[in-house]
Amino acid sequence: LSFGVVEPAGTRHLLALDVSASMSGGEIAGVPGLSPSAATAALAVVAARTEPWTAVMGFSDRFRDLGLTARDRVDEATRKVSGLTFGSTDASLPMTWALQNKIQVDTFVVMTDNETWAGNIQPVQALEKYRQATGIGAKLIVVGMTSTGFTIADPDDAGMLDVVGFDGATPALMAKFAKGEI
């Protein structure tokens, strides 16, 4: 990946990386030999280096800061997101955490390898609750590292996008969506 070719969206990003055990094995759609955790780490580094405000958090049944920064190399970031085992995976945590902690977010990015709803509220409902409570027209980008036919984003909501797989165009696509260009 080349960090210089990604134009920033200029929005406040909250990246939520699935850190469940399944992310360390297998391959992602589009890049044979690349694990889901390594791909999410690479995307997180790109966002941290290009966006003016980016928080990178890990999730499964809990939500926590991964300590990943713009200064991290991809291999360092991969170490920070690999081997963390929590319980079941709850993709609503980014929105509920931001709401509870009064964090202003324009773009939530959830990176996972499979359908993830193990909580009390579905991610789509959590986003709507966040939007209503904050007045922010927050967007949701779900990056599915493996193609399992799932969707977390609501296909009828223009503020939500599902992306499956990974290639060099993924960061630019995400930035354009966050800016409202697509």
PLM region spans:
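Acidic, glycine-rich A-domain
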Residues: L1-I182
